[in-house]
Amino acid sequence: MEVEIRLGSVRYPFRLGTDCLGAIVEDLVAMSASRLLIVCDSNTGPLFGAELVERLSPRVPANLLIHRAGEPYKDLQAVGTLADSALQLGADRASVVVAVGGGVIGNIAGLMAALLFRGIRLVHIPTSLIAMSDSVLSLKQAVNACVGKNLMGTFYAPESVLADTAMLRSLPFRETVSGLCEVVKNSLAIRPSMVEMLRTSLRQDAVYDDETMYEIISESILAKASVTVDDMHECRAGLVLEYGHTVGHAIEYTAAGGLSHGQAIGLGMVVAAEVSHRLGHLDQEAVALHRELLTRAGAMVTIPEEVDLDEVMHRLRFDNKRGYLADPAESSAMVLLGGLGEPLWHDGRPLVSVPMALVGEVVNEIARPEIPNFELVAPVETVEEGRVPDTVGAADG
């Protein structure tokens, strides 16, 4: 499958297949790069990066650059360290940065490509579900600041995305669920026609065959493309992709690696749905659907007690959507839904100014829920986050 990703005036191909590493190698060789800089983390390097370099090296200069895995290490220091290594290896303007990993490596390598020589070519080889179905469908390349997530970065387009669903077979439970939470987001906020497919396909054990993964990724591509085609900087219609991210980012940052990105966003969606319901916009059936789909995906819908709720509320003040609305001092700009696939708009953007007191009230209740969690009619065994059912491997989400 090949689709053209359209983000405003930007176009690039997304090639999706299964067991297609040979084709990926041919695509990379065809770029006639002076050097291929294969950027991985400490998980994806041994799993995929080493084999890529081995296959490429007889035909084109290729080097493996490995960074420590994990969201806590997504910062400017990582970008600088990897860029210095690339330059010492002989990188020049004709080199290509190849990001092999999940969302973290994609952002680090993407920002590195944008900065080296003021911009060299970039290719994404996503190895996680969250990357294949979400992060590579964007021009955003960003790293974290000391006060919050994704506060330093730029917009930079890849030459192409080359994806092999076979790479998802090594994905741990935690990272599969992480990606599925973003897929659920796309269905609830953008493409409700996906809901019945997800109800049928989602599994609490997070074990999927290649065909199901292919369908899930394909549907997510269509969902995301529909709101970014005329909004390459994701500052108007594309802001709907931030659904669940206001509180979700704050939870993720506070958890300091204890929760995956997608799991935190899932919790952020539960908060956003309940906030919208209390403001009189979203009906209870739609709120319950949030919990149902997340539960079916194997995600938690209660904020863990280890997460410091006061710190979560503090981190909301550093959300990367600040400034889009003329927010009162004690409020937060959030993407809220008035119905499935129906974000609420204000001043030309799908954002609503919400009192911080209401957000805090809902956050506290979801951490110590009086609202019952959704229970499947025919429950199956739930695998705890972090447990790897069969295979060990990873991408970084």
Curated annotation (Swiss-Prot):
Cofactor note: Binds 1 Co(2+) ion per subunit.
A GO term for molecular function: metal ion binding
Thermal dependence, as annotated: Optimum temperature is 42 degrees Celsius.
Family: Belongs to the sugar phosphate cyclases superfamily. DOI synthase family.
Record's catalysed reaction(s): D-glucose 6-phosphate = 2-deoxy-L-scyllo-inosose + phosphate
Residues at the catalytic site: 140, 242
Cofactors demanded by this protein: NAD(+); Co(2+)
Transmembrane domains' residue ranges: none
Pathway: Metabolic intermediate biosynthesis; 2-deoxystreptamine biosynthesis; 2-deoxystreptamine from D-glucose 6-phosphate: step 1/4; Antibiotic biosynthesis; gentamicin biosynthesis
GO BP: antibiotic biosynthetic process; aromatic amino acid family biosynthetic process
Role: Catalyzes the intramolecular carbocycle formation from D-glucose-6-phosphate to 2-deoxy-scyllo-inosose (DOI).
EC annotation from Swiss-Prot or TrEMBL: 4.2.3.124
Gene, per the UniProt record: gtmA
Name this polypeptide is given: 2-deoxy-scyllo-inosose synthase
Binding locations of Co(2+): 182, 245, 261
Keywords, alphabetical: Antibiotic biosynthesis, Cobalt, Lyase, Metal-binding, NAD
Broad class of enzyme this protein falls into: lyase
Keyword Membrane recorded: no
Residues where NAD(+) binds: 41, 71-74, 103-107, 127-128, 138-140, 149-150
